[in-house]
Amino acid sequence: HIDFLEETIGHIPETISCRYNPGGVFELSNGIMDNPGDSKYGMTKDQLIEAFKILKDKGAKHFGVHAFLASNTVTNEYYPKLAGELFELIVELKEKTGCDIRFVNLSGGVGIPYTPDKEPNDIAVIGEGVHKKFDEILVPAGLGDVSIYTEMGRFMLGPYGCLVTKAIHEKHIYKEYIGVDACAANLMRPAIYGAYHHITVLGKENAPCDHVYDVTGSLCENCDKFAVDRMLPKIDIGDYLAIHDAGAHGFSMGYNYNGKLRSAEPVSYTHLRAHETRSNLV
């Protein structure tokens, strides 16, 4: 799509990054994490080499490489393994194209544990693993000045936001349903990915989880469910439910389909210290 880029913006930027897709499956010690070969994104290695040569001839001076091989991996192995693959790739790109490679973007994000039984990633261990690969691969190749970028939105924000919603309906047919006043317009992940988000019934944190519910929104789509066959305390109309780990991919992925209006976003914070005034010095 180099011609398309050139036609769209009128030139080739001096700094440009290309996305790599290694194909196949991406595996770690705990099994297959994702299947890049099925992804519509990125270039093969041969395409990437050719693209760098063409872009260089068209005036690009500084290059970056990006890859996204798995999403929300709750393991400290992902980033070091991804870094190793990309570092080896840019050494080869440098040798075969002579391009000035300035940065690498390790994508996919440091994952967060959406289920209570999982341990969180250790960011220090991840950093040490990436640093080790950097020293082993890039430094000996004369690429010790390459910058590393990454994407930490979910890691920084995900665990620190909740979607608070009110139980407004109940239905007893072939399953037990609790309808709430939020819907997929407020949090899409369960509807589009089948993703798990932990749910707490506020005020009933210590009550036995002895009821099986589907917790649903009000969209005219059967996938609009925050929980399916979830063991929860008995929920009464008017109870408030906290849907956890909604600080990322929440409001930003929201929409107005079905005439839905997105919720407010209150922020809770504490002043640790007031700013100083001149009177503090007197």
Regions found by a protein language model. Name each.
Residues 20-22, 66-69, 108, 152, ...:
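Short, structured patches in soluble enzyme cores that scaffold and shape functional sites
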Residues 24-28, 102-118, 149-160, 187-188, ...:
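Flexible glycine/acidic-rich beta-alpha junction loops that bind and position SAM and/or redox cofactors
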Residues 271-274, 278-282:
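Single conserved hydrophobic/aromatic residue that forms the stacking wall/gate
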Residues 138, 143-273:
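Charged (often Lys/Glu-rich) extended helix/loop segments that serve as interaction or gating elements
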Residues 7-8, 26-33, 76-79, 115-119, ...:
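Short acidic, glycine/serine/threonine-rich loops at helix termini
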Residues 1-103, 112, 133:
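Active-site-proximal beta-alpha core segment in soluble small-molecule metabolic enzymes
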Residues 75-82, 113-126, 157-169, 228-231:
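Short glycine/threonine-rich loop-to-helix capping motif typified by GTGT followed
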Residues 14, 99-102, 121, 125-128, ...:
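Acidic/histidine-enriched ion/cofactor-binding microenvironments in catalytic or ligand-binding pockets
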